[in-house]
C-alpha cells in the first residue's frame, strides 16, 4: 500500500469516528458533564430502545436510524 493510500485510510477512519461520535452524542446527549454525575435514565432508555430495534431487525441497523432520535 502506498503512502497516499495509507494517509487516505487514516483520514477515513478519523472521519468515520467523528461522525459516529457526533451521532451518538445526539442520541444519548453528553454522557458526562465532567463531574461524574449519575447518568440520565432517559438517555439510556433511548439507547436501549435503539439497540432493541437494531437487534430485532439488523438490516435497519445503520447510522440513518440514529438520526431519528436527535
UniProtKB/Swiss-Prot annotation:
Modification Phenylalanine amide, positions: 69
One Pfam family named in its UniProt record: Toxin_8
GO MF annotations in UniProt: acetylcholine receptor inhibitor activity; ion channel regulator activity; toxin activity
Range of residues in the leader sequence: 1-21
Subcellular location: Secreted
Tissue-wise expression: Expressed by the venom duct.
Cystine pairs: 54-61, 55-67
Function: Probable neurotoxin with unknown target. Possibly targets ion channels.
Protein name: Conotoxin Pl171
Organism name: Conus planorbis (Planorbis cone)
Amino acid at each position: 500500500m502506498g503512502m497516499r493510500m495509507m494517509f487516505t485510510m487514516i483520514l477515513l477512519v478519523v472521519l468515520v469516528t467523528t461522525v459516529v461520535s457526533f451521532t451518538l452524542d445526539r442520541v444519548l446527549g453528553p454522557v458526562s458533564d465532567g463531574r461524574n454525575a449519575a447518568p440520565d435514565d432517559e438517555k439510556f432508555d433511548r439507547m436501549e430502545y435503539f439497540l432493541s430495534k437494531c437487534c430485532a431487525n439488523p438490516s435497519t441497523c445503520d447510522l440513518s436510524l440514529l438520526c431519528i432520535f436527535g
